[in-house]
Amino acid sequence: MSHHNTAFHQLLQPISRHEFESLAKQHHKGQKLRSASRWDQFIGLSMSQLSCRQSLRDIESNLLSQQNKLYHLGAKPIARSTLARLNEQQPYELYQAMFYKLLSRCTTDVTKHKFRFKNPLYSLDASAIDLSLKIFPWAKCHQTKASVKLHVGLNNASLIPEFVALSDGKESDLIQGRQFQFPKGSIVA
């Protein structure tokens, strides 16, 4: 079977399969997995996130249609019942540990951008994430709308977000920005 590097394969290159598998063993809970691995779950969830899939059935059909690409990523299609069971029973700490491992790698590998500022420069931004009012009644921000805000403090020298917070949709960007602990003398834009 001929192999072609896909954009998704290139996106996954910073994630070492060996590191992922060792973290998966550390964060495993319950019986041994028979029909699917945590790598299959990760690939399936990543592909579904990037292709805006909205249901388990949609994820399953997308993965089945991409079998040849999954093969080259070392994964196989995963049934919706298996994916639901893995999402429910296996702890999320695997992905949290993988995130922090990638973040530490990114902070050491990144080249510093030169600025004329003597002090560190940070960009503060917030994005509203719309939610369904029926499913998330706790996130009500208007009579017919529910949302949360994702606040990010980006270090412009390393281009890595150093501060992240989630708040209700009504909260001002400045209120959350004042709660971030920026280094003394920083310039915040």
Predicted regions: what they are:
Residues M1-A189:
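Conserved, well-structured functional cores that handle cations and Mg-NTP chemistry
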